[in-house]
Amino acid sequence: MSGRKFFVGGNWKMNGDKKSIEELANTLNSAKLNPDTEVVCGAPTIYLDYARSKLDPNIDVAAQNCYKVAKGAFTGEISPAMIKDCGVKWVILGHSERRHVFGESDELIGQKVAHALENGLGVIACIGEKLDEREAGITEKVVFAQTKFIADNVKDWSKVVLAYEPVWAIGTGKTASPQQAQEVHDKLRQWLKTNVSEAVANSVRIIYGGSVTGGTCKELASQKDLDGFLVGGASLKPEFIDIINAKA
């Protein structure tokens, strides 16, 4: 056993309303969830407070983004301090949709990671290659570069979960094979060992995201270096329970 606690995050993205969030919370609260798995639900900003009030205290909540400073003239942004004020402990940063739809740079994501950690939030930091990058054989080059910008901004790795999400597998129904996922996770751990420390490489959780379903989760979860999942669409459905219990 690695000693790393299995971690399952649900990223609701821009989905849901009060009615559906309450229904989902009731489903999760009444389900038998593996007590050895850490569970976090990423709610839309406007529903952070509501999700926190409806979910069982054993289920944490994450914001899906935050800005790199505490307050100021940044219309539409939210700060880690505001997130914490809602009773929320985590934030997802660097998701491929933030990178590719909203044009966030590696540098900006690194700055956001630093500020979130300084303010006591846990960070789910996302990395991953696009299809043309995988086909060009530069997967490692891309994910190592993204990881470096994150690593350069981390002082305390105990509050960081790395999420490897191959962009070509997000919302497409394509999933990296368990072997493909394990290969990248293993290479990431080696990179951390070389560039950060062996202790961090052994302790940091590296989770997988990209069309994870109730049907694919068990075999993925059996991979040595795969410490959990960041789940998109399936986190809005009852099958999220099967994914949480993939290690049960």
Curated annotation (Swiss-Prot):
Keywords: Cytoplasm, Gluconeogenesis, Glycolysis, Isomerase, Lyase. The keyword Ribosomal protein does not apply. Pathway: Carbohydrate degradation; glycolysis; D-glyceraldehyde 3-phosphate from glycerone phosphate: step 1/1; Carbohydrate biosynthesis; gluconeogenesis. It holds the Pfam family TIM. One of its GO terms (molecular function) is protein homodimerization activity. It comes from the Eukaryota. The active site is at 95 (electrophile), 165 (proton acceptor). InterPro entries: Aldolase_TIM, TIM_sf, TrioseP_Isoase_bac/euk, Triosephosphate_isomerase, Triosephosphate_isomerase_AS. PROSITE patterns: TIM_1, TIM_2. It catalyses: dihydroxyacetone phosphate = methylglyoxal + phosphate; D-glyceraldehyde 3-phosphate = dihydroxyacetone phosphate. One of its GO terms (cellular component) is cytosol. GO terms for biological process: gluconeogenesis; glyceraldehyde-3-phosphate biosynthetic process; glycerol catabolic process; glycolytic process; methylglyoxal biosynthetic process. Substrate binds at residues 11, 13. It is found in: Cytoplasm. Its main location: cytoplasm. Homodimer. NCBIfam families: tim. Belongs to the triosephosphate isomerase family. Triosephosphate isomerase is an extremely efficient metabolic enzyme that catalyzes the interconversion between dihydroxyacetone phosphate (DHAP) and D-glyceraldehyde-3-phosphate (G3P) in glycolysis and gluconeogenesis. It is also responsible for the non-negligible production of methylglyoxal a reactive cytotoxic side-product that modifies and can alter proteins, DNA and lipids. This is Triosephosphate isomerase B. It comes from Danio rerio. The gene is tpi1b.
